[in-house]
Amino acid sequence: MAFHALEKLMFLEDGYRREFVINGIPLLLLQEGGRPQLIRNQCPHRGQPLTHGDVSNGVIRCPGHGWSFNLSDGQCRLPGPGPCLTRYALIYEGTQIGVDL
C-alpha cells in the first residue's frame, strides 16, 4: 500500500466533491456535516457513479435508481437491506488528506 494525497485540507468544506481513480478504483471524496468521506464512486446496486447523487443528513442517494446509503458506515437505507457502499479510511498527513491503497 502507498499513501495517495487527495486534497489539501484548506479546500475541504461542506458540499465538496471530487472524483479520483487510484489503482483502477473509482473514488469519490466528499464532505458533508463537517466530515470528509471517501467512498467507492460506484453504487453497489448497479455500478452507477455516485458523483451527482444527492447528499443530505449523512446519506448519499444514487442518481440512477434512488438507492440510499449511510456515509458513516456504508449501510443501505433504501430500499432496505442490500449491498453496502464501500468506504475507505482517510489519512491526515500534514496539510493534506489522502488514502493508503
Where are these regions (language model features)?
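Short cysteine/histidine-rich metal-coordination sites, predominantly Zn2+-binding motifs
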Residues: 57-63, 76-85
